[in-house]
Design a protein with these regions (language model features):
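Short, Gly/Pro- and small/polar-rich lid/capping loops
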Residues: 31-56, 61-62
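Glycine-rich, flexible beta-strand/loop modules in the N-terminal catalytic cores of phosphate-handling
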Residues: 46, 58-142, 148-150, 155, ...
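Gly/Lys-enriched N-terminal cap/neck module of very large, oligomeric protein machines
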Residues: 52, 57-61, 143, 178-182, ...
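Stable alpha-helical structural segments in soluble proteins, enriched in small hydrophobic residues
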Residues: 129, 160-172, 235, 242
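Mobile "lid/hinge" segments at catalytic clefts and subdomain interfaces of large enzymes
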Residues: 173-276
């Protein structure tokens, strides 16, 4: 006999619930046959990955918890290439939700508005490191959507979203030469800090975001207050060392549950474009 019970879950703070089944041989998540969870440490905080929980019709999907920040990433691809284009049609959307910070839209329609400037910049920040790793001759539409479900001020949802995206693409059947990961680096009182919290970000002399693979750095975004070159280089290298650990973690997840990459129709590439 199966008994359905609603147990409190922390995904949405006190308001989150998850359906569980009690069976004679113990409880099981009968609603989620492919449910898996993975855990690791990231810059001194626990990072938890959940897969097989939602969006089973997408090519790849996951939830990533970093502190109390929760981001869901979904990636889908068209089965056939788009006709009449000479570029890779990738779209990346970072969607903020007011309920992630405990608010409800106060407009007349009570609905979310257009993307904020921060959301647009975050979408571009995630696009830059992942786009070059797709096959240059692929023309299938690929859509990445990151949805912020909960926000912890001390744990960046932007970095969490980048990692969630890398995991979703890695475990999907979409061809990709990843994984990558990202990290935020600060400089507080002369000390390099990885993924600084809210208080540290308020007084940091360096606001650095690094994305990279196990072998190399693929994206740097930075703002600083007269930081010396050797300190900047040290911050980048220390950030990359932490990135390597997360990349290895993602590779392990991919080895366990990753799908076989599909074959795509190769489109001609104008190689003269790369020599100009």
């Amino acid at each position: 006999m199966v008994i359905l019970a609603l147990n409190r879950d922390s995904h949405f703070g006190d308001s989150g619930f998850i359906a569980k089944a009690a069976t004679e041989n113990g409880g099981s998540l009968f609603m989620f046959e492919n449910y898996k969870t993975f855990k690791t440490q990231f810059a001194g905080r626990e990072l938890i990955v959940e897969t097989g929980k939602t969006c089973e019709l997408s090519n790849g999907s996951c939830w990533v918890h970093y502190g109390e920040t929760v981001v869901m990433a979904n990636v889908t691809a068209s089965p056939k290439p788009r006709e009449g284009v000479d570029f890779f049609p990738l779209s990346v959307d970072y969607e903020e939700r007011l309920y992630s910070v405990g608010k409800i839209p106060g407009s007349f329609t009570k609905r979310e508005g257009k993307p904020s400037e921060k959301a647009i910049l975050t979408s571009r920040m995630v696009d830059r490191p992942i786009r070059p790793l797709f096959p240059k001759d692929m023309r299938n539409d690929v859509s990445v959507v990151m949805t912020v479900l909960a926000v912890d001020p001390d744990c960046s949802p932007e970095i969490t979203g980048m990692i969630a995206t890398a995991i979703a693409i890695s475990i999907s059947d979409i061809p990709w030469n990843g994984p990558i990961a990202g990290i935020s680096v600060g400089l507080v009182d002369g000390e390099i800090v990885l993924n600084p919290n809210l208080e540290q970000r308020a007084k940091t002399d360096l606001n650095l975001t690094v994305a990279g693979s196990a072998e190399k750095i693929v994206m740097i975004e930075a703002g600083a207050n007269q930081v010396e070159d050797d300190i900047m280089l040290d911050a980048i290298l220390k950030g990359h060392e932490e990135i390597k650990k997360i990349v290895a973690f993602i590779s392990d997840i991919q080895a366990q549950i990753g799908k076989k990459k599909f074959e795509f129709e190769s489109q001609e590439v104008d190689h003269d474009m790369f020599t100009q």
